């Protein structure tokens, strides 16, 4: 998994899967990346993210260096989908979702990175989004800050970064399989709970 907000490191964690759904440990979130430029048929990528605190909702952006793909951070799949779909509908930008509602949204319909709004209105919307982002994330300067969102996928930096092609190692420039081992733990049964085996 990816550890850290600005300077990332490789991490290892054991997670449980129940009914096909990964149970996120406390302090972990998901990062999801979708290729949005139509250059290849990449499957959306997802990885565990540690070091962003307890995200209470989702943060989505298409302003994400260097590839500017659609990136979503969060713990709740519904909020993540809501934020992502808001950006898809508006042609890009940034969005915050929490408990099934969009808290704030800045549309950037020009290449997913620029707005055609007057500067004063764009500044007002962006200030609102930045201020409301503290309802979703616990910011801890200097590294875990709102601006760090746009660099979460900057694969030219050292350490692990999720891209539209997969989890990459910034040092080796290789795509890495994030799943190292998988084992099944049987559910407890009455027989397993009785030391006599009766």
What are these regions (language model features)?
Residues 8-13, 49-52, 73-75:
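A short linear-motif detector with a strong N-terminal bias
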């Amino acid at each position: 998994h990816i550890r850290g907000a600005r300077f990332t490191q490789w991490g290892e964690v054991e997670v449980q899967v129940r009914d096909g759904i990964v149970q996120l440990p406390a302090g972990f979130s998901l990062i999801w990346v979708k290729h949005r430029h139509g250059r290849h048929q990449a499957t959306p990528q997802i990885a565990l993210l540690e070091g962003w605190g307890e995200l209470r909702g989702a943060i989505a952006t298409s302003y994400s260096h260097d590839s500017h793909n659609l990136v979503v951070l969060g713990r709740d799949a519904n909020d993540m989908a809501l934020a992502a779909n808001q950006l898809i509908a508006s042609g890009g930008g940034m969005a915050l979702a929490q408990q099934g509602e969009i808290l704030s949204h800045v549309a950037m319909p020009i290449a997913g990175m620029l707005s055609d709004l007057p500067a004063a209105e764009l500044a007002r919307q962006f200030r609102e989004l930045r201020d409301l982002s503290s309802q979703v994330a616990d910011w801890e300067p200097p590294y875990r800050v709102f601006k760090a969102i746009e660099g979460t996928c900057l694969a030219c930096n050292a350490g692990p970064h999720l891209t539209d092609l997969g989890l990459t190692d910034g040092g080796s420039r290789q795509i890495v399989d994030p799943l190292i081992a998988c084992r099944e733990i049987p559910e407890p049964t009455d027989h397993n709970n009785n030391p006599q085996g009766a």
